[in-house]
Regions:
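Rossmann-like AdoMet
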Residues: 1-145, 152-169
Length: 169
């Protein structure tokens, strides 16, 4: 099982690198290092019952870290753009400390979180919603109320709470 977990970590790190997601790549990589040292991550995933690659164990760990940042963990939030933070490669040692701390402090919550597969819908698509809904609001002059019926589990209902970077000519 240890080899399968290492393979899952390697695969996810590579995918994040190819997709240009340095923060998630480093979160997964630091969890991988912690696992290899026998730290809290090894304790959390020891005895995993399924296939760690198919079950997206590394993404579950990364998802928990992001969830904690969104829930107000200031030590992690400072790295996540979705929380108004910024991550740079030089921050990796501080990120390692923050990750170890949150997994240690929130071990029970992490165990509960790891039971569920991650929601992997791409919320970046919400940028188009922001533009479209801004135009609708401008034209109608009315407040916008939304309901989402579909596969994204309401993620796009929060389009106004995401952080956007727009390129301007």
């Amino acid at each position: 099982m240890t080899d399968k977990l290492r393979t899952a970590f390697d695969a996810q790190e590579n995918a994040c690198d190819m997709l240009g997601s340095p923060l998630t790549r480093d979160v997964v990589g630091l969890c991988h290092e912690n696992f290899n040292r026998g730290g809290i991550i090894a304790k959390l995933v020891r005895g995993w019952q399924g296939d760690p690659l198919n079950d997206n164990v590394p993404l579950r760990l990364a998802g928990f870290a992001h969830y904690q940042a969104l829930s107000g963990d200031e030590n992690l939030a400072r790295f996540y753009e979705s929380c108004g933070g910024l991550y740079q490669a030089a921050d990796r040692p501080d990120l390692a400390i923050a990750l170890d701390g949150v997994f240690q402090r929130e071990e029970a919550a992490a165990r509960r979180f790891l039971r569920s597969a991650p929601q992997t819908n791409e919320t970046g698509r919400a940028a188009m919603l922001l533009l479209g809904f801004s135009e609708v609001s401008k034209r109608l002059g009315l407040p916008l109320r939304l309901r989402e019926m579909g596969a994204s589990a309401g993620l796009n209902l929060f389009f106004d709470q995401f952080h956007y970077r727009l390129a301007m000519d």
